[in-house]
From Swiss-Prot:
Binding site for ATP: 335
PANTHER family: METHIONINE--TRNA LIGASE (PTHR45765), METHIONINE--TRNA LIGASE, CYTOPLASMIC (PTHR45765:SF1)
Record-given protein name: Methionine--tRNA ligase
Keyword Iron: no
Amino acid sequence: MTESIKKILVTCALPYANGPIHLGHMLEHIQADIWVRYQRMRGHEVYFICADDAHGTAIMLKAEKSGINPEKMIEEINQQHQNDFSGFLISYDHYYSTHSDENRELSVAIYQRLKAKGHIKKRAISQLYDPEKKLFLPDRFVKGTCPKCQAPNQYGDNCEACGSTYSSTELIAPKSEVSGATPVIRESEHFFFDLPAFTGMLTQWIHSGALQEQVANKMQTWLTSGLRQWDITRDTPYFGFEIPDAPDKYFYVWLDAPIGYMGSFKNFCDKKENVSFDEFWQTDTKTELYHFIGKDIVYFHSLFWPAVLEGSDFRKPTNLFVHGYITVNGAKMSKSRGTFIEASDYLKHLDPDCLRYYYAAKLSSHIDDIDLNLEDFVQRVNADLVNKVVNLAARNASFINKKFAGILSKELADSELYFTFVQAGLRIANAYHARETSKAIREIMALADLANRYVDEQAPWVLAKKEVDEAKLQSVCSMGIHLFRILMTYLKPVLPALSERSEAFLNTELTWDSINEPLLNHEIKPFKALFNRIDNDKIVAMLKC
């Protein structure tokens, strides 16, 4: 590598610890994992961190309904989440929880730094209170009639019918979603983070050129309309961290959740002698920090989070990498339509590399939604991975193994074609780095077409019938194996399981920097099936789960 080695910290948004991982979640974790694996292949020092977001009223109420304490519930869900991510070959260096000593200490320290600098304000607010559950109701736990358009059955913060936003205390005829009781209005003293004080810094960040254009434009809209102080308080009963010197007051989950990136990394660093937490989080750091997130949480990550970090003397993210939503067969994931697919149900029936490939073939650096069309999914995986890539190895390896004891030719049959494949590596590398994964896949599949055309034109099955052409047969089939090796090297960030099986077959590690040299006079292993075609019956079985 000519590029200097970078130190990079990468995170995904923290999954909420009140339910299973589904294929919508997996888009982000697969996108980030492909980028991380590519950066590692190029020699960079990358740490890939995540955790469960384990606080909040929703978790407290679900645990109560399940008859267990919240700590036990989040521990069980954390293990399920880790199993799902491991099943999809997400290469986390560390996966933790926001309900940790490290996160508590960092949350308190950040709050105290903000308070010392005058960035924490205090005032009384009016909230809806459930008199039966003795609970202040979050916006999502109360429904009523929209005060703007009179649409019934709307949540306490915004109307899905007319798009208006409002305070829950403005709802007409509100009802608690927890108990069904009619809530009453009560006052409570809350702490606020003075977000407007950071308008200048956030404006500079928007115009730095680092952020995705769509993100910068959205931030500009929010800044133009004016920022408001952010309520970081929740009242007891609540599952989270208590605010120092404020009895019965807790940090709002959206304060300690992003601090969970730091808490998870701190726990990781404390177990490693050669990784420094401060090096990655101090304000003058030379390291890079990237957050992969969905478009639904841009507001928190582009405004609140960098302002909190700035105000507490920690570094800000180098960039936010934002993606869109997943639809299935053109519509929102739905339990009633059978398209709400849990990660664990997918893994019971299908290879994780199939979904990794399909998402990769559609992902870009933009914030567009991606459709998981199950018919197209089957067709594309079978056509690209089975027919084009794996078949390239199979149709050539049979001759090499049978006639030449697994030894590749001493000479390169077509050096011009070989170096066409090598030179394509720069375009593919640039696409991976820029998160234009679909562009990388298009480039790779165009090469796969070239490789198969070469084999078709050389017709080794015809050469095999002419004993005088054995040297040419070995050379042609070896060329097919060389091209398969390059293709699999380029696909390695996307297809870790298939890459590992391919490395065993090729009897060599797939590294980006080694493809300049073909495997001349090299012994390959006997060919075994590398990848199975997707059967429609497996899709049907998965949807029935």
